[in-house]
Design a protein with these regions (language model features):
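A short, Lys/Arg-rich alpha-helix, primarily the initiator
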Residues: 1-21
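Short alpha-helical DNA-recognition segment
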Residues: 20-38
């Protein structure tokens, strides 16, 4: 799985679990909606730590919580 896919899946999990939209996350994180849409679609291959931290801030979670899932612990994670 690529990093882009892992990030997209993780964002989707949080959006679904909390019943929020990308637009709400954009507002809460301070990121442009276009950036989140591109991440969600996997069009941003290697998101920066700053972007991930803003997403986490918008979700009110730590980066550790965001990355704490099988998607990111897999030895098969592809670096694009």
């Amino acid at each position: 799985m690529s990093i882009a896919t892992a990030v997209s899946k993780r964002i989707n999990e949080y959006l679904f679990a909390r019943g929020i939209t990308l637009y709400k996350l954009a507002k809460d994180s301070g990121l442009p909606i276009a950036t989140l849409q591109n991440l969600y679609r996997g069009q941003i291959k290697t998101p920066t730590l700053a972007v991930l931290l803003k997403i986490c801030s918008g979700l009110n979670i730590s980066i550790i919580e965001f990355l704490d899932c099988p998607y990111f612990s897999s030895c098969d994670l592809e670096l694009d």
